[in-house]
């Protein structure tokens, strides 16, 4: 808890915010629970910081290897998340991978055993196929803007990445739309749904 408090203080200070909002606090409260998370929220709600704080709270300096993977639908979002991480996660090795970026440069960065990887589905899948990303130590998987990933046609790449991951301890799926069903390959474990869509001031917390 002491480490989490320090993480929150550092994030607020470096991002020039006074305190966490309700969504961010609720996300952190789920960090040690065994349930996976479905976070439904609109753009500009503080979603990125909400899941990044949870991810960072679970990273251990004692483990060598990739502990967290954040999959996003676009280069722009990958760079945005990478920028936030650079401000709040000093000392943690982070690699950002996306189409249009130098594969050679990414490969060199991946060779130094990052703890956290952010990237787009196609580029992440390609690095995995070539053995540049190994996910045997993966603890936390984030599928950010999952609805957009599907809308952009990344279902096959995402299934290729996610289906083999049998030992991931926590999955976080974010979306701006609510759906009654999810592709089977997500394989969420007793997910808790945090719903911040619409005009609600507080979330609905629904174990499903």
Where are the language model's segments positioned?
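P-loop (Walker A) phosphate-binding loop of NTP-binding proteins
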Residues: 40-43, 73
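Post-DEXD/H (motif II) to motif III coupling segment of the RecA-like Helicase ATP-binding lobe
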Residues: 134-202
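Conserved nucleic-acid-binding Ia/Ib motif block in the N-terminal RecA-like helicase ATPase lobe
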Residues: 5-10, 63-129, 137-140
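Pre-Walker A (Motif I) flank of P-loop NTPase domains
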Residues: 33-39, 64-68, 114-115, 169-170
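Conserved pre-motif I regulatory segment
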Residues: 1-40, 144
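Short glycine-rich anion-binding loops that position phosphate/pyrophosphate groups of nucleotides
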Residues: 44-45, 122-124, 147-148
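Conserved interdomain hinge at the start of the Helicase C-terminal
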Residues: 205-208
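Walker A/P-loop NTP-binding motif
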Residues: 25-37, 48-63, 79, 84-88
């Amino acid at each position: 808890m002491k480490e989490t408090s320090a993480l929150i203080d550092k994030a607020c200070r470096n991002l020039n915010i006074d305190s966490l909002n309700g969504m961010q606090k609720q996300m952190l409260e789920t960090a040690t629970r065994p349930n996976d998370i479905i976070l439904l929220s609109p753009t500009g709600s503080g979603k990125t910081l909400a899941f990044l704080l949870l991810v960072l709270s679970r990273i251990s300096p004692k483990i060598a290897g990739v502990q967290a993977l954040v999959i996003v639908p676009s280069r722009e979002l990958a760079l945005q998340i990478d920028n936030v991480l650079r401000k709040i996660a000093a000392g943690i090795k982070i690699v950002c991978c996306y189409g249009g970026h130098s594969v050679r440069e990414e490969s060199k960065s991946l060779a130094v055993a990052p703890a956290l990887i952010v990237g787009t589905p196609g580029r992440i899948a390609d690095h995995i196929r070539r053995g540049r990303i190994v996910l045997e130590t993966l603890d936390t998987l984030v599928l950010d803007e999952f609805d957009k990933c599907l809308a952009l046609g990344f279902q096959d790449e995402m299934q290729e990445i996610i289906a083999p991951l049998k030992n991931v301890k926590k999955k976080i799926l974010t979306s701006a739309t609510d759906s009654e069903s999810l592709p089977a390959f997500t394989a969420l474990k007793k997910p808790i749904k945090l719903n911040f869509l619409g005009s609600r001031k507080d979330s609905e917390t629904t174990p499903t």
